[in-house]
Amino acid sequence: MTTYRRTGILAGAALAWLALTVPVHAEVRSAAPDAFQILFNEKVAAPPSAVYGAIGQIERWWDGAHTYSGDAANLSIAMQPGGCWCERWAGGAVEHARVIMLMRDQAVRVEGGLGPLQNLGVNAVLTFLLKAEDGGTALTVGYRVNGASASGLDKLAQPVDGVIGAAVQRLKRYVETGKPAP
C-alpha cells in the first residue's frame, strides 16, 4: 500500500471519527473557502447565571488537548470588555481571543481565531447566548470565521466544529456535574 493511500485512509477514518463525535444538535451552517459558520444548541440543566459563571472558568472545562501547553489549567478568561482569553505557561503565552461583549447571564462574545485559525489572519467571533428555559438554560454557541479565499476555511469547518462541539459538551457537563469529562 502506498504512503498516499494509507494517509488517505487514515484521514478518512479521522474525519469519520470527528463526524461521530460531533453532537447531533451541532451544525456547520455554511462553509466556503473564505468563511464558515458553525452553530450549537444545547439545553443545560442549570440557570443562566451558572452557565455564565462557568464560561469564565474555562480552565475547568476546556480540553487540555486543544491548548498549546497541553494543560487547560493554563487558560483564563478575564470576564470584562477587552479581557484576554489567554494561555500562560513557563514556556510561553498565547492570546486566543479577546472579550468584546458581556451581558450578565445572557451573552459572552469573544473575538479571535482559535488554534490553527490564528495563523491565517482571520476575523473570528465566538458567541455564547443564554436564555432561561424550562428551569434551565437554552445555550446557543456560534462561531463565525471570515478570511481570505486562499485560507481554505471550508476544509477547516468540520474539524473546528468538532473541537467547539466537544467544548460545548464539556461546558454543559461541568455546569451540571462539576466535571467536564464523562
Residue ranges: model-predicted function:
Residues 2-13:
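Bacterial N-terminal signal peptides that target proteins for export
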Residues 17-25:
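C-terminal segment of classical bacterial N-terminal signal peptides
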Residues 40-42, 95-101, 124-132:
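Hydrophobic/aromatic beta-strand elements that line small-molecule binding cavities or substrate pockets
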Residues 51-54, 85, 99, 110, ...:
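Hydrophobic pocket/interface hotspot
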Residues 60, 70-115, 177:
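Glycine-rich portal/gate segments that line the openings of hydrophobic small-molecule binding cavities
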Residues 115-162:
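Beta-strand/loop substructures that line and gate deep hydrophobic ligand-binding cavities in soluble
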Residues 173-182:
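Short, highly charged C-terminal tails/helix-capping segments
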